[in-house]
């Protein structure tokens, strides 16, 4: 797992730097030889539309200038956001619970990736004072439009610098060790303690040899065994396992969670602070943290395995790192300028609004063309309004859900609004319907959808009391020695 994380960090940074480099190059409108990054040699008149070229061109790309452009504040901020999302997505499918505190683990991966990226860019600026030559053939005058450039040489240089930066970063090494250890079962000091006990038993108590002090030593050994058993069941290491970006949270009404009782509700500013708060409270066995209210709900009592496993099963990592920050409001009036959010549903007249923000101000616009579609569909289904909005991805459209709008938010700059148009809800017509037409795309809303930040997500966690395995082994060995020794003593007394 450690090697996989190392590879993920390299791929995450390289791909995002490559994409940013391509964006910079592809946005250049170059006149003659005045391009900052690309100098293209041409002869004669006419425009060049260099579309999708890779090697059939005659140009030079200034690596140093490109690296400086990557390093400017706006580009760097955008890169950091993309790297953060890619880094999180890179470990989807990993059971974060086995890594302990997911809040810390995710932040460590993101921060380390950004550090490596910064080092790689600085190295590009310092080391490279060269231009990469490519060839393009053109005769005539005119402008040159560069589009969809993808150069293998740039990719090689970026990959090399990212690898160098990663290999010299101590935080990467720590992450690799952390992920590697998560898959190993490790008992500190186990071998030495068992070995010491065996040596003590055979040498001092005389097992297999001379019986020395058995009348006192072996009863004491049995008492020590009982003490070791007691310590094994009562002396535990208290650790917390957390998960972020969760849909399903702990609730005393959940199946299997009936043994939990509400302990306390407190204000906590961050997900990390919430997990620390529960860990420090000796009565806390599980917690939920709500990012909207900034409150932690702690639970006491017995945490059944069924309850814990059900929460873990429902909080899968398939899409949790890809979620967008989409705020939906509902009300019985149309939204006003001060209403914040991305989408607004007027439940009274069944209208859907979207907020195209300009200059950081709210600007609400109604999807007027869709109002009639929604109303007509609702009337046909015998209701006066649609009931709910759900969110997901277009390729994962659910089964028929009458009276529902489905919002696909998987795209970076727009939403797709689907309506479940079931006109036949009973009988043969429903069974024999064309299921591909259950959902109809009624609108595409162009919005700048922000990615979720880690602290803008709900999280939950459980306390795990881990027994010390070496104590159990000590108890068993002491019990064995005590019983055998007492038996030898009784036999000797009879003789």
UniProtKB/Swiss-Prot annotation:
Q: GO cellular-component terms in the record?
A: membrane
Intracellular or extracellular location(s): Membrane
Main location, first listed in the record: membrane
Q: In its UniProt entry, what is this protein called?
A: Putative myristoylated membrane protein 458R
Positions with an attached lipid (N-myristoyl glycine) read 2
The record's family statement is: Belongs to the IIV-6 118L/458R family.
Enumerate the UniProt keywords alphabetically. Coiled coil, Glycoprotein, Lipoprotein, Membrane, Myristate, Transmembrane, Transmembrane helix
Q: Which residues are glycosylated?
A: 58, 71-72, 103, 111, 262, 314, 317, 349, 457
